[in-house]
A protein has these predicted regions:
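Nucleotide-activated sugar donor-binding and catalytic core shared by glycosyltransferases
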Residues: 1-391
């Protein structure tokens, strides 16, 4: 193409916001700054110069019931997003996360202006649930950039060009300094440290805070010198801080911002984490982790009734390794007692922690692929603008 391309990036969750920002940096580098951006995103994309066209704070939604409850809000956001994209008239739109919202935005843009190239960055996990989404996506966008090397056949069967770029999560977390972290926060060198991560969605905080709090209460009784470290995610910061202040088991917990997360991981003996991108980040840092998740009960019942949950595991690390390197306690198993027992099994066995740490690092190294994922994604975006699908 000729001229300076305008690329519109859409991300509504914290992880997608970080992916969008990394992609923008790579596009800037590869074009020598000869690229313009607009979009919808959060703090990370704002730092790269994108003033979000809409407020994304209420759009990070997971599950059918949460989706129904937020239907009017999401419908209005979709309409506003499509209107802004058509007003800006970019050369391409890169849609990163939140399947229901981004799909409807893509469909709206395609219907109104087929000349705008549509690129999905990170596809829905059709290998795990609802394989029909592959055909839906293939009928809507021009190209898929996938972070999983086994994703492609599901989409290519429907004629969608797919490019495996690797997982950018694995490149953005730098090696931390656990010793310096302990010194900064007055944590003794030999004291056990548990990092607790509640999730980045409001619904995750609502469902996981209780079980995690009960687990931490049990663990603090079992390990009197246990230090609790809690990284705070931007979209849910106010809600989480308010809950922590009212829960005695978190008295004295160390709350850290994103800038200290790598050091916090390096200082941790183990982690208790809501399932999501952060589990991959913890694995990259070699932190033995227990992960957990709860869907709304109606959503869970429907998923089981219609056999929609196809995958053996829920975390990408376990799926990639085809082994439960990260213990998963989901739905009815996600109780304070069960979580405390699983974390305690890690805390009590230094040899097991060392073995798991090594296997987690080896697995995420394989997931990373060759080179830098954000650079490969940027190459694919530029190829699409030039009319190539890389096939």
């Amino acid at each position: 193409m000729t001229g300076t391309p305008l690329i519109y990036v859409v991300a509504v969750e914290r992880s997608g916001d970080l992916l969008g920002a990394a992609l923008m940096r790579s596009l800037q580098a590869k074009t020598g700054g000869e690229v313009r951006f607009a979009g919808i995103g959060g703090r990370a994309m704002a730092e790269e110069g994108v003033s979000s066209a809409i407020d994304i704070s209420d759009l990070a939604i997971f599950g059918w019931i949460d989706g129904l409850m937020a239907y009017k809000r999401v419908k209005a956001a979709v309409a506003a997003s499509v209107e802004d994209i058509l007003r800006v008239k970019p050369d391409a739109v890169v849609l990163i996360d939140s399947w229901g919202y981004t799909l409807r935005v893509a469909q709206g843009v395609r219907a109104a202006d087929p000349s705008i190239r549509l690129i999905k960055y990170v596809g829905p996990q059709v290998f795990a649930t609802r394989p029909g989404r592959a055909a839906t996506l293939a009928a809507t966008v021009d190209r898929l950039l996938t972070i999983l090397d086994f994703d492609a056949p599901y989409y290519e069967a429907h004629g969608l060009p797919v490019t495996f770029v690797g997982n950018p999560t694995l490149e953005r977390l730098e090696a931390g300094d656990g010793t310096a972290f302990r010194a900064r926060h007055a944590i003794p060198a030999g004291a056990p440290v548990l990092t607790v991560l509640f999730g980045s969605r409001t619904s995750e905080i609502r469902r996981m805070f209780g079980p995690f709090a009960r687990a931490v209460a049990r663990l603090r009784q079992r390990y009197p010198g246990l230090s609790i470290v809690i990284p705070i995610a931007d979209p849910v910061e106010a809600d989480l801080r308010a809950r922590l202040e009212n829960e005695r088991c978190f008295n004295g917990a160390v709350l850290v911002e994103e800038t200290e997360k790598a050091d916090a991981f390096a200082a941790a003996d183990a982690a208790l984490a809501c399932s999501g991108t952060v589990v991959t980040e913890l694995a990259t840092a070699g932190v033995p982790t227990v992960t957990s998740y709860r869907l709304g009960w109606i959503t869970w019942a429907l998923a089981r009734a219609f056999n929609l949950m196809k995958a053996k595991y829920i975390s990408l690390v376990n799926i990639s390794a085809d082994a439960e390197l990260v213990p998963e306690l989901v739905q009815t198993r996600a109780t304070g007692a069960n979580l405390a027992e699983a974390v305690g099994a890690l805390m009590d066995d230094a040899g097991r922690r060392e073995t798991l740490s090594r296997k987690l690092i080896e697995t995420t190294a394989r997931m990373r692929g060759d080179g830098k994922a954000s650079d490969r994604a940027a190459d694919a975006v530029l190829e699409t603008l030039d009319g190539s699908t890389g096939q």
